[in-house]
């Protein structure tokens, strides 16, 4: 009997879970997924935490203690999210040790309201790194223009980074440069960079959502034939750039000093369009040295009926370039698509963060009144 997730791992794709909750940790579900589904990493975001906290009473005791202490909402959010991430880091510590620090990572996002403020992002990254206090933590920083310098400085201070909200190829080039510059600065400061790690989270399904809406408006048969093809092509071309960037003398010098490459991570991998296969953003993005973070529904769908027939990125670069040329030919402005997606991405996380703050504030209020 085939085991698609095991086959995916054997193909060199690291399987991560895009979810975290205290319930998942306390019931042993995360440990089960690590043991039986080959999960070797976890990503989180404000939306995930807001859902977890609003739908469980497992946070009540900590919220009660925080309310008695008079902790403000911002500090309460840090304390609660850091506790879950710390516990998840402990669940995955064995994976981290066994993989030499490549996998076993858990990601915690900085306040997304700081996405355009480099210095405050760096300060928040340092605070979260200290608060969680686990070597297998990733601090998530968005790939905004301000975020790029924060990424460099965070890495330079010896803090591992998950660069999030990457949509476009040119911005991805800048992310790789920010990563390498951070390592170079860390090395120049005398830091050991062998344990310093990073992933670059390239968002996938949202590209199809935005492009397909525009293709529908164009309405021609040529345009409609391109629906559901932009996101995979975009990710494949990103991997092509990754291969080129990490085959340079600049990277060779860093690798000789013990640096690990910044792996591409495919994020936003749940299928939004019901006409597309529910595992398309896994099956079509298989290459060694990549990460695919999936919500549990996608993970279980792939376990049930996913297929691995070999690499699906590198042999299809030419096809990806052709898709981009066809999109341009029918009138899709890809630069505008990417700019729109980045703006929407930051705003969505800001909105989720505000909801998270409101949820925590309400719980603090009720916990405090019952004290």
Swiss-Prot record:
Pathway: Carbohydrate degradation; pentose phosphate pathway; D-glyceraldehyde 3-phosphate and beta-D-fructose 6-phosphate from D-ribose 5-phosphate and D-xylulose 5-phosphate (non-oxidative stage): step 2/3. One of its GO terms (cellular component) is cytoplasm. InterPro entries: Aldolase_TIM, TAL/FSA, Transaldolase_2, Transaldolase_AS. It comes from the Bacteria. Its EC number is 2.2.1.2. Keywords: Cytoplasm, Pentose shunt, Schiff base, Transferase. GO terms for molecular function: transaldolase activity. It is found in: Cytoplasm. It is an enzyme of class 2 (transferase). It catalyses: D-sedoheptulose 7-phosphate + D-glyceraldehyde 3-phosphate = D-erythrose 4-phosphate + beta-D-fructose 6-phosphate. The active site is at residue 140. Coiled coil: none annotated. One of its GO terms (biological process) is carbohydrate metabolic process. The keyword Cytoplasm applies. HAMAP family: Transaldolase_2. PANTHER family: TRANSALDOLASE. Transaldolase is important for the balance of metabolites in the pentose-phosphate pathway. Belongs to the transaldolase family. Type 2 subfamily. This is Transaldolase.
């Amino acid at each position: 009997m085939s085991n698609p997730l095991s086959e995916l791992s054997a193909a060199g794709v690291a399987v991560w879970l895009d979810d975290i909750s205290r319930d998942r940790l306390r019931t042993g579900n995360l440990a089960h997924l690590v043991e039986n589904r080959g999960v070797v990493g976890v990503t989180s975001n404000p939306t995930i935490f807001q859902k977890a906290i609003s739908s469980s009473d497992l946070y009540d005791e900590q919220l009660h203690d925080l309310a008695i202490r008079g902790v403000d909402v911002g500090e309460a959010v840090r304390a609660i999210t850091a506790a879950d991430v710390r516990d998840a880091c402990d669940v995955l510590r064995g994976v981290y040790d066994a993989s030499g620090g490549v996998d076993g990572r858990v990601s915690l996002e900085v306040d997304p309201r700081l996405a355009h403020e480099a210095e405050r992002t760096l300060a928040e990254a340092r605070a979260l790194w200290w608060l969680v206090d686990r070597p297998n933590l990733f601090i998530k920083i968005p790939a905004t223009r301000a975020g790029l310098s924060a990424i460099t400085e965070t890495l330079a201070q010896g803090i591992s980074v998950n660069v999030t909200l990457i949509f476009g190829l040119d911005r991805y080039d800048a992310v790789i440069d920010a990563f390498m510059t951070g390592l170079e600065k860390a090395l120049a400061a005398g830091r050991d960079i062998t344990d310093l790690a990073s992933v670059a989270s390239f968002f996938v399904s949202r590209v199809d959502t935005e492009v397909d809406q525009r293709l529908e408006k164009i309405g021609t048969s040529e345009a409609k034939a391109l629906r559901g093809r932009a996101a995979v092509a975009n990710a494949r071309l990103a991997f092509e750039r990754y291969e080129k960037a990490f085959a340079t003398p600049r990277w060779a010098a860093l690798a000789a000093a013990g640096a690990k490459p910044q792996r591409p991570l495919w994020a936003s991998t749940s299928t939004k369009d019901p006409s597309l296969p529910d595992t398309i953003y896994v099956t079509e993005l298989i290459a060694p040295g990549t990460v695919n973070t999936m919500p549990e529904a996608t993970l279980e769908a792939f376990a049930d009926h996913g297929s691995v027939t070999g690499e699906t990125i590198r042999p299809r670069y030419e096809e990806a370039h052709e898709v981009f040329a066809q999109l341009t030919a029918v009138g899709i402005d890809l630069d505008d698509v990417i700019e729109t997606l980045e703006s929407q991405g930051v705003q969505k996380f800001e909105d989720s963060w505000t909801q998270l703050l409101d949820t925590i504030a309400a719980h603090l209020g009720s916990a405090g009144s019952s004290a």
